[in-house]
Regions:
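N-terminal hydrophobic targeting/anchoring segments and the immediately downstream early-domain regions
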Residues: 1-141, 147-157, 210-212
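Histidine/acidic residue-rich metal-binding segments in metalloenzymes
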Residues: 26-27, 123-133, 154-201, 213
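Histidine-centered catalytic micro-motifs
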Residues: 34-41, 184, 202-205
Length: 213
C-alpha cells in the first residue's frame, strides 16, 4: 500500500479530484518524466500508483537504524516485490532505466536509504561497492542525528563530515550512488558539497531562507 488508504471512499475521492484536472495539465503530466523522490515501503502495484502517472519512485528501503543484515533483508523484500510485479515495475540501476520505464509504461523503482549506519565498516569502499551491487542508488549520510559519517540537522554541535564521512562520500560518488543531503546538518552538507564531483540532491527539503529548519 502507499500513503493513501486503500478504501473505496478514498479511491473515489482521489478519482473525483483527478477528473477535475484540466486536459492541458494532464497532457503535460503524461508526457513528462515524473520522479517521486521520497516514498517509503511498498507491497505491490496498486490502483493509486497507476493513477499517479509517475515515471519513477524512490523508495526508503530500510529503517534508519538498520544494520547491514537487516538492510539486506529489506532490499530483498523490495526486489522481490519488483520481480512479482514485473509487468508494471522495473528496478532502476542506471539513468536510462528511468527512460525505459517511461517508454514501457512502467514505474521505475529506485532503492535508497535515509541513513548510512548499515555501511559502517573498516573498508567503506567495499561496503558501498557491495550495496551498489545489491541495487542501492541513493544514500543519505545522516538522518537528523549524528552518524559515523556526518551530523544530522537536529545535532546541535553541527559538526562537519568525519574522516569516515569523507571516505563515504568519495565511495558513493565512485560507484554511482547519489548522495542525498536532506536531514543532514549544515556543516556536513557544505563539506559534502565541497567534495561533489557528481550531482547531489535534497530529495525532500526547502531553501533555508524560506523555512529555517
Amino acid at each position: 500500500r502507499f500513503a493513501c488508504e486503500d478504501t473505496p471512499e478514498v479511491k473515489q475521492m482521489i478519482l473525483d479530484i483527478n477528473a477535475q484536472v484540466p486536459e492541458a495539465a494532464k497532457g503535460l503530466h503524461e508526457e513528462s518524466i515524473i520522479i517521486d523522490q521520497c516514498n517509503f515501503s511498498f507491497e505491490s502495484y496498486s490502483w493509486n500508483l497507476a493513477e499517479s502517472g509517475i515515471t519513477a519512485l524512490a523508495i526508503t528501503s530500510m529503517d534508519t537504524k538498520a544494520d547491514a543484515g537487516v538492510a539486506i533483508r529489506y532490499l530483498a523484500d523490495d526486489i522481490s516485490t519488483i520481480h512479482h510485479n514485473a509487468d508494471h515495475m522495473l528496478l532502476v540501476e542506471k539513468p536510462d532505466d528511468i527512460l525505459r520505464a517511461k517508454d514501457e509504461n512502467k514505474v521505475g523503482i529506485i532503492l535508497g536509504s535515509q541513513n548510512c549506519e548499515f555501511l559502517h565498516h573498516n573498508d567503506l569502499d567495499a561496503t558501498v561497492y557491495l550495496f551498489h551491487k545489491l541495487g542501492m542508488r541513493i544514500i543519505m549520510p545522516a538522518y537528523n542525528h549524528r552518524s559515523f559519517a556526518a551530523d544530522g540537522c537536529y545535532q546541535s554541535a553541527n559538526a562537519g563530515l568525519s574522516n569516515d564521512g569523507k571516505k563515504l562520500i568519495a565511495a558513493l560518488q565512485k560507484y554511482g550512488v547519489t548522495v542525498d543531503l536532506s536531514h543532514v546538518g549544515e556543516r556536513s552538507t557544505l563539506d559534502a558539497l565541497e567534495m561533489a564531483e557528481k550531482p547531489m540532491i535534497f530529495s525532500h527539503s526547502n531553501p533555508k531562507k524560506y523555512v529555517d529548519h
